[in-house]
Amino acid sequence: MELEIITEGRTPLKVPKTRGQPSARDPVFYNPAMQLSRDLTVSSLVQYGPKIVCDPLAGVGARGIRIAVELSPEVVVLNDLNPRAVELIEENVRLNDVEDVCRIENRDANALMHEDELAGRFDYVDIDPFGPPVPFLDAAVRTVRNRGVVGISATDVSALAGRYPRSARRKYWVEVERVEFYQEVAIRALISYIVRTCAKYDLAFEPHIAFFQRHHVRVIGEIRRGARRADRALKRLGYLLHCRECGYTSEREFDRECPRCGSGSVVRLGPLWLPDFADRERAERAASDARELGLEEAAELLETVAKETGTNPWAYDIHRWASRLGLSRVPSLTSVLEGLREEGFNAVRPHYSKRAVVKTDASPEEFEAVLTEVAGDSGCLHR
């Protein structure tokens, strides 16, 4: 295995030299494309100041060692079942001179979280698997302390985003189909599963920061103990009904016939987390911390996540809506955002899209009215 030394944030790391897309079959797994995700995690955790940290699926140790170096906790437990990964973790711990902070284990991740001497006392537990987090989630939410924080990643977004609805049904117990705001659905489906997993143990989950980035979903949030809190969290789950024909979307239940166009092409998505998937103050503070750490791309993404709060749990694709409405010209994203804001709506391009997509608190009817009006006097958007 050929190695190279790279630097993430302020942390040098010895990693496998990559040739092509990383695979679970690699001798030791490391995905350089996930550096931004790790930047976002470190930035988001500054405000919590975790002292006791668990990284049970550490790989080369990138995430956990970055936390050890950049956040100065008291203890970081780094674990991987792969002996070759453990050897590389040991090298990276020595490389960063954090032997006094890091404890390295070579165990099954679930066994570690259930049986470690610090089980139940962790301030932060990070679950970043290759694939779904489902096999590790029960142990993770139970090993963190009351009011502790978990960071959960899912890379099987093809399931969460509705491309493979049967897979989503089996793994996450959620009904999803591919819709134009599939990234939004994926984030909310994962949060829903975390909430339902916590509720089994009389635990409540509150998402603080969530994002969809490079084909994975990441959620960071707080665990609280108590059956009543768990009940309240469950009440925040619900369904979205979306018409494939006209794009109408609503949280309100209606018959399978769309109330806007009368089409029967309505899909029911859920149960999903329907409130904001981020806390505005937490996201803004994380953005500020990212900037102080010199992580500019992470700061910009977190600022956008903060701006998305207070909008609908879906998004509008300007091109698709213009086509459905038969508009002769497609208005620019900027003109649509400005038009919505002039009418008093919150409006932003979501963090997960580079296309002409809008998140807003405007209803479908209100969005249609603004889009139609703006199309009459705006320039065209060419893509």
From Swiss-Prot:
EC class name: transferase
One biological process term in Gene Ontology: tRNA N2-guanine methylation
Role: Dimethylates a single guanine residue at position 26 of a number of tRNAs using S-adenosyl-L-methionine as donor of the methyl groups.
GO MF term (any one): tRNA binding
Occurrences of domain Trm1 methyltransferase (ranges): 4-371
PROSITE patterns according to UniProt: SAM_MT_TRM1
Entry EC no(s): 2.1.1.216
Pfam families per UniProt: TRM
Family note: Belongs to the class I-like SAM-binding methyltransferase superfamily. Trm1 family.
Catalytic reaction(s) noted: guanosine(26) in tRNA + 2 S-adenosyl-L-methionine = N(2)-dimethylguanosine(26) in tRNA + 2 S-adenosyl-L-homocysteine + 2 H(+)
Keywords: Metal-binding, Methyltransferase, RNA-binding, S-adenosyl-L-methionine, Transferase, tRNA processing, tRNA-binding, Zinc
Annotated Zn(2+) binding sites: C243, C246, C258, C261
HAMAP family the record matches: tRNA_dimethyltr_TRM1
Gene3D superfamilies: N2,N2-dimethylguanosine tRNA methyltransferase, C-terminal domain (3.30.56.70), Vaccinia Virus protein VP39 (3.40.50.150)
Protein's name in the database: tRNA (guanine(26)-N(2))-dimethyltransferase
Recorded superkingdom: Archaea
Binding site for S-adenosyl-L-methionine: R38, R63, D80, D108, A109
